[in-house]
A protein has these predicted regions:
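Conserved small/polar residues in nucleotide/adenosyl-binding loops
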Residues: 434-441
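Conserved S-adenosyl-L-methionine
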Residues: 153-270, 286, 294
Length: 443
């Protein structure tokens, strides 16, 4: 709602909402937990492939495509009538190609990677929705990641976990097993309220016929929502290579001032001097081999009990036997999917003295997820939505992000700034937009 959306409805692995074109741009740019934003262009019913073909062919495709552009179709199918999603995608492609061939004898090309127009068809039994994908590459690919360790945490999941805790930068945040630094980086972005889309080189809607460059420039270059962060985010790992990778990623995000990294095993974790929160994703033993996985979780429990008193710790894992080794009673259990793994995100309140006394003193700290525009959701969002920015570049040596206004396209390989040459300004057009769907993480 803070972004201006209306008619918000939470569904299964998706959220629908309505708004104008500006709302669509903002949804892509600001939402931390969305995987993609889809704009539905046709709803219909079909019981077989021929009916899908005819429905797609009836669309006035010159409004969205021309023969000089490429397109691709992604199909998501949950239906007894349609068992093969690839076959559905082929029928949609055939309908579009035949539409143009019959119109002018020419056809647009099909390109799987980075097409000019990306389409999505969703079928649930006989209910079909064809949408324009306004995001393109998955929104979890922020653009700051230079390298990754084995089995890195998805950026969208990391952001969702942080938002679930209610933390917004009120105290120090610690990830004692940070790997390539995803949780620390996402935490610093949340604390500073920096839009996750600021690192992206491109969104799919920038190739649309009605793309409003001036409008998107205004959205991109508006940093008025950013805020100061008076605490720190700490990321520790016992692997020197992981620390090196995390350092590169933090620097690429321009967050070296906010994020402090250190090579340190969890066994050496000591009681913080200031109020802190731990959010971490230890190894599960699924894709990462751990010689003594249960011993690792037992050690985690011991360090929390003896070196984190008076604070809260949130841990993501999927093995019950691992959680058992922690030896602490969780106050909150949140089911999450980390890829295909059914995990749980558990909160542990560490305290000194008697538990009853602690509960009395901390009544106001009971888990109450915040409801706001960046709240964690399942797997989608929908908007009904009305310029081109100079891509933002971060100089890691400066004091803060408020030191400049004009931002250039981010060079992923270094911190240099590239000259941005804006396109010609488009004339204002009156266009009617319908719903958008934003797919979000399985969490």
């Amino acid at each position: 709602t803070e972004l201006g959306a209306s008619n918000i409805e939470i569904g299964r692995r998706m959220v629908s909402f309505t708004g104008d074109k500006e709302m669509m741009y903002k949804a892509n740019f600001y939402l931390r937990t969305a995987i993609r934003i889809l704009k539905p262009i046709k709803h219909f019913e079909a019981k077989n492939a021929d009916e899908v073909y005819e429905a797609i062919k009836s669309i006035a495709w010159e409004e969205y495509l021309d023969t000089n552009k490429s397109f691709a179709v992604d199909a998501v199918v949950f239906s007894n009538e349609f068992r093969h999603s690839k076959f559905v995608a082929y029928k949609v492609k055939d309908a579009i190609v035949d539409y143009f061939r019959e119109k002018n004898g020419e056809r647009p090309s099909i390109r799987i990677n980075n097409p000019d127009v990306a389409l999505n068809i969703h079928i649930a039994e006989d209910k079909c929705t064809l949408s324009l994908d306004s995001s393109g590459e998955s929104l979890h690919r922020r653009g700051y990641r230079q390298e990754a360790v084995e089995a890195p945490l998805n950026e969208v999941l990391a952001a969702g976990m942080i938002l679930m805790t209610g933390w917004r930068g009120e105290c120090d945040l610690i990830d004692p097993m940070c790997g390539s630094g995803t949780i620390p980086i996402e935490a610093a972005l949340i604390a500073r309220n920096i839009a996750p889309g600021v690192f992206r080189k491109e969104f799919a809607f920038e190739k649309w016929n009605d793309f409003d460059q001036e409008l998107f420039d205004t959205i991109y270059n508006d940093d008025s929502q950013e805020r100061e962060f008076t605490h720190k985010v700490y990321g520790y790992d016992n692997n020197p290579k992981a620390n090196e990778i995390a350092t590169h990623n933090v620097k690429a995000a321009g967050l070296s001032k906010e994020v402090i990294l250190k090579i340190q095993p969890f066994q050496q974790f000591e009681q913080p001097k200031e109020k802190s929160i731990i959010i971490t994703n230890p190894p599960y033993g699924e894709r990462i081999s751990t010689n003594d996985l249960l011993g690792l979780y037992q050690m985690i429990g011991e360090r929390l009990k003896h070196a984190f008193a008076g604070n809260d710790a949130w841990i993501l894992s999927y093995r019950e036997e691992c959680f058992d080794q922690i030896g602490l009673k969780p106050s909150v259990k949140v089911p999450l999917f980390n890829g295909a793994l059914e995990c749980e995100f558990r909160k542990y309140q560490l305290f000194d003295g008697k538990y009853k006394e602690f509960r009395t003193e901390n009544k106001d700290r009971d888990f109450k997820p915040r409801r706001e525009d960046t709240r964690p959701r399942r797997n989608s969002e929908r908007v009904e939505y009305g310029e081109r920015r100079e891509r933002r570049n971060f100089d890691d040596k400066r004091e803060g992000r408020g030191d400049f206004k004009n931002r250039d396209r981010k060079d992923r390989g270094n911190e240099e700034r590239k000259e941005f040459k804006p396109r010609f300004k488009r004339e204002e057009k009156s266009v009617s937009y319908t719903h958008l769907r934003a797919h979000e993480t399985d969490s």
